[in-house]
Each structure stands twice: as structure tokens, then as C-alpha cells.
Amino acid sequence: MAKEIKFSEETRRALEAGVNKLADTVKVTLGPKGRNVILDKKFGSPLITNDGVTIAKEIELEDRFENMGAQLVKEVATKTNDVAGDGTTTATVLAQAIIREGLKNVTAGANPILLRKGIQKAVTVAVEELKNQSRIVETQEAISQVASISAGDEEVGKLIAEAMEIVGKDGVITVEESQTMNTELDAVEGMQFDRGFVSAYMVTDVDKMEAVLNDPYILITDKKISNIQELLPVLEQIVQQGKKLLIIAEDVEGEALSTLVVNKLRGTFDVVAVKAPGFGDRRKEMLQDIAILTGAQVISEELGYDLKEADLSMLGRASSVKVTKESTTIVDGSGDKKAIEDRVTQIKHQVEQTTSDFDREKLMERLAKLAGGVAVVKVGAATEVELKERKLRIEDALNATRAAVEEGIVAGGGTAFVSVIPAIGTLIESLEGEVKLGAQIVKKALEEPLRQIAINAGLEGAVIVQNVVNSEAETGFDALNEKYVNMIEAGIVDPTKVSRSALQNAASIASTFLTTEAAVADLPEKEDAGMPGTGMDGMY
């Protein structure tokens, strides 16, 4: 296929136009007075959201060169979401600012390679300064503040803080849609491990690509299953009972897998197979954990059990099991409470005895899965449109809270970025030439999140930024109440991990963007000319 090529200034302007179209759409959502964006969906009602990455993923531009620019910024939002789970709008705003300031310098004749070096140096200093300013999150109140700011809702903040209190820092919290109008917390015992279904044909919900089994039997074995004959005796008993089955095995392959899939598709029985978590001796211990939690017996030849002789009494039970491509969550296993408590005590004893940090970490993970349980935030709303919007906000808040527990918090509302500017100023004094210009680009861009928050609140951004720059440390602008406050004391905080990831990803993409000198895109296909007219319109 023929290609269209653009060079230098023409390339950069086309790419920048795409960057601006995407960023301008996303940045209207920033801050407590940010607006929402409505997204058209081919099926179902439109989605209204303020989630940066959700908006960015929907944007495809007609012009191929502009679209390339938009896709680059989309990568900033996506990467930030993958790493931190929140801060995608902030990352987009920072990327746009660095690109805008950088292009001014490139157009004026600056070398983009040296600019990039300066940008990288400045970001390294800024990230280090953010870490220095970071405060550890210890109280339930601090967790509540982080979640409240991210979701823009105090009630949600309290709910997530309560969930974390119940399951602990290492517990599992999931977000589900409620059948009622109320948003509530439901905490249940459960376990999650990082193994998903062995075949995508086993899913029960194609849209979410997940399999949900209610009240299933659970078969646990440490062997590889490739012959369906080994499973037939227990499968026949399952079919007679009309129940669903979760198989946890070293692997399920060959004839066994194909037979299970075919019968699942035919509706003969509902079965999902997953690989056993962990490796070696740790796998054996984790299988035993799952067995104790569900009241099952691990079917292992080492223990003298043969799969062909397995019956329903050796299988575990749970109220529900949710399996995705990457994880399996077992909720409300029907194991003996005393046996579970004994197992928890045993693992705690092992934690005290071990001298290996790695072993201790893995034991603590097992302890959290066995003792922590699963908290479910059930999101309710009057309409489906509001429900989806609210669910996205709560998922963001949950991600922000986890990030805060992991790396601490800094002043929110764009204040943390402004507060690292003096450190970059010190760096700039030690630099020369175009590397110095690169650092100055970052210095200017760091003001942008605060400026945009002020603009979205209907205020003059430049004035607000100047006032915060001249204020004491941690003093920022509370856009909701339109006053200057100590952000930490006021509970307006951001997770350090979110702020750090947003800046690093924005700078990474933006600095690479500036080094672009040519762009290549497919030429649009020409439409075939129609049949020539006969000159006798309307006659056949």
C-alpha cells in the first residue's frame, strides 16, 4: 500500500493537533469542579464519565497523522492507569504541556535530543523531591481522604476506608453493580490467586471476559489432567447433581480440555479449569490453603489419592467463584472454621521462624488470602448511565487508595507538582545550553495541573498558580471552596505513586515525541468510481 510521508515542522504540527484534540477533551474533567464527557456506545446507552483513560481510549481521529499524535498521548494515560490505576487526566495534562513548550523550543532551533536529556534530568529531580515530601498513610482517616478526593465523594471515601480496615492492606476489594439504588459494602471471606481460566471458551460473561460460578463444587489436584477418562467418574456425579465445577490442577490440556470445552458450549455442564497457583513446594502449600478454605481434599498421589476414585465428598464448596483471564477469586468457602484458624496460626508461626525476606513476603501473601477475605463494594444508582459513571469513579478511588498505602501521599490539587519547582530551579542553575532549556520545559509544565484545576473551576489559572508558588510548603488552592489552605491538613491529598507515575509517563512520551522528524502513514484508499450514468435518470 502507498504511504504518505510528512517531514519536520509539518509532521510536528499535525501530531500536535492530534495531541491537543485528545488532551483538550480529557482535561475538562480535572479537579473537583471538572465536568464529565459523554461517550457514544454502539450498543446500549451512552457512557458519561470523568475517567481520563476511559475517554482517551474512545478517541480515534480521521486524519491519520493527527491520530498518531492522539495515540501517543493515549499511551500516557493507559500506562499511568496500568501502573497506578488513577491520575490519567493529570498525566495527559502534563504530557500536553511538555509537548507544547518543547515544540516552541524545537521550532526556534533547539536540538530535541538535548532537550530530551534536560527533560529527563528535571523529571528525575522532581520524582526524588516528591518521594521526599511523601507521608506514610497509617490511619483510616487518611485512607478515607485519598478515596474521597479521587471519587469526589466523601461517602465513597468512608466506604473504601472501611473495606480496607476489614480486609487489611493486602486483602482483596472488588467493585460490583448493585440491584438497589444504594452503594454499600459487603465483606465476605474469600481468596484470590493469580491464575485465570485455561480456555476463553469457559467464560460466562463475554463482555467482561469472566466466568462466574455460583455454588460450585471445587476439585483440587496437583497433577496434570490430559485424559478425560480420569475425570469422568466425578463429572458424572456433578451432572447428576446439576451443579457447576471449578477444577484447579497443575494443567488441563489435550483431550480433557477439548472435551470440557465442547460440553460447556453444548450446555451439558458448567465447568471452569484453572492452573494451580505458585510453583514447587509453594504450590503444594497454596493448594492445601485452598482445600482448607473450601473444605476439599487435595487429590494427590503423594497422599494416596487417585483422581479416578474421587467422589463428591473430596470436593470443596464455595458460594461463588469468579475467574478472569488473570485471576480466580473464591468467595465464602465452606471449609471448617477451626481448620482455617489452625492454618492461619501455622502460617503466622512460619513467618516468625523464617529468615528469608522473600519467603516471609510469600507467607504474608498466603496469610492475607486466607485470613483477609474479600470486600465487595456494591455500587447502586437510579439509572444505568449514572451507575456506570459512579462505578468508574469508585474503581479509580480504590486504585488511588492502594497506591497511597503503597508509597504514601503528597499535597493534592496540583500543589505537589508546584512544590517541587524550587528543586528543579536549583538543577537548572547547574545546567547549560539546550539541556537547561529541557529542564525549564518541565518547570513550566509542572504548573499546568493546578492551572487547569483553576480554569475548570471558572477562575484565572495564572493568578492561582502564582499565589501558590509564592506560598508556604503544602499550601495550595482548594478549588471546591475557592480558598488557599494547607492541603494535607484539609485532607486534599494525592497518592505519591499516582503523581510520580503521571509525571514519569508524561515526560517519557512527550520527550520522545519532540525527537520526531518524519511521520509515515497509509494513504486513504480511493473509492471505486460508480457505474457511468446513462443520461436517463429515473428510467430502467
UniProtKB/Swiss-Prot annotation:
Enzyme Commission code: 5.6.1.7
Residues spanning the signal sequence: none
Assigned GO CC terms: cell surface; cytoplasm; extracellular space; peptidoglycan-based cell wall; plasma membrane
Quaternary structure annotation from Swiss-Prot or TrEMBL: Forms a cylinder of 14 subunits composed of two heptameric rings stacked back-to-back. Interacts with the co-chaperonin GroES.
Taxonomic lineage of the native organism: Bacteria, Bacillati, Bacillota, Clostridia, Peptostreptococcales
Enzyme class: isomerase
Keywords: ATP-binding, Chaperone, Cytoplasm, Isomerase, Nucleotide-binding
Major localization listed first in the record, in broad terms: cytoplasm
Catalytic activity line of the entry: ATP + H2O + a folded polypeptide = ADP + phosphate + an unfolded polypeptide
Binding site for ATP: T29, L30, G31, P32, D86, G87, T88, T89, T90, G413, D478, A479, L480, D494
Substitution effect: L235V: In strain: ATCC 43603
Pfam assignment, any one: Cpn60_TCP1
Similarity-based family: Belongs to the chaperonin (HSP60) family.
Function: Together with its co-chaperonin GroES, plays an essential role in assisting protein folding. The GroEL-GroES system forms a nano-cage that allows encapsulation of the non-native substrate proteins and provides a physical environment optimized to promote and accelerate protein folding.
BP GO terms, sorted: adhesion of symbiont to host cell; hyperosmotic salinity response; protein refolding; response to acidic pH; response to heat; response to iron ion starvation
Descriptive protein name: Chaperonin GroEL
MF annotations from Gene Ontology: ATP binding; ATP-dependent protein folding chaperone; isomerase activity; unfolded protein binding
